[in-house]
Amino acid sequence: MSWQTYVDDHLMCDIEGHEDHRLTAAAIVGHDGSVWAQSATFPQFKPEEMNGIMTDFNEPGHLAPTGLHLGGTKYMVIQGEAGAVIRGKKGSGGITIKKTGQALVFGIYEEPVTPGQCNMVVERLGDYLLEQGL
């Protein structure tokens, strides 16, 4: 299965029980910042934004004072799981990033999708990739 298929079929899909509710954007990005696959709507990010995200996974709390930036959008960092998941909020939307052994799984959402639904979609794929040794 191609990485693009994971993005299209497992991240940008209808959310269970909520037809027409789906993430706004999604991607799978290597720890080095190389994009493995992304939705057409995923923002163009700067290398320093990806570096900040990777630093926060290694040093939890690193992004809290400045916020998480992706594609020029600033998200307020909210409770995640140290070293495993970063969550951010901006207005009625937000972002979830799950770290696997080799990649970061990104999901970006806006209402009517809820933070919990985004977390479920992103973390389910991230957990699957971890189980596969990826």
Swiss-Prot record:
Post-translational modification remark: Phosphorylated by MAP kinases.
GO-annotated cellular components: cell cortex; cytoskeleton
Phosphothreonine PTM sites in chain numbering: T114
Key word Nucleotide-binding present: no
Molecular function per GO: actin monomer binding
Keyword Phosphoprotein appears in the UniProt entry: yes
Disulfide-bonded cysteines: C13-C118
Position of sequence motif Involved in PIP2 interaction: 84-100
Main localisation: cytoplasm
Cellular localisation: Cytoplasm, Cytoskeleton
Keyword annotations of the record: Actin-binding, Allergen, Cytoplasm, Cytoskeleton, Disulfide bond, Phosphoprotein
One Pfam family, short name: Profilin
Subunit structure: Occurs in many kinds of cells as a complex with monomeric actin in a 1:1 ratio.
Biological function: Binds to actin and affects the structure of the cytoskeleton. At high concentrations, profilin prevents the polymerization of actin, whereas it enhances it at low concentrations.
Classification via PANTHER family: PROFILIN, PROFILIN-5
Similarity-based family: Belongs to the profilin family.
Remarks, miscellaneous: The variability of the residues taking part of IgE-binding epitopes might be responsible of the difference in cross-reactivity among olive pollen cultivars, and between distantly related pollen species, leading to a variable range of allergy reactions among atopic patients.
Protein's name in the database: Profilin-3
Species the sequence originates in: Olea europaea
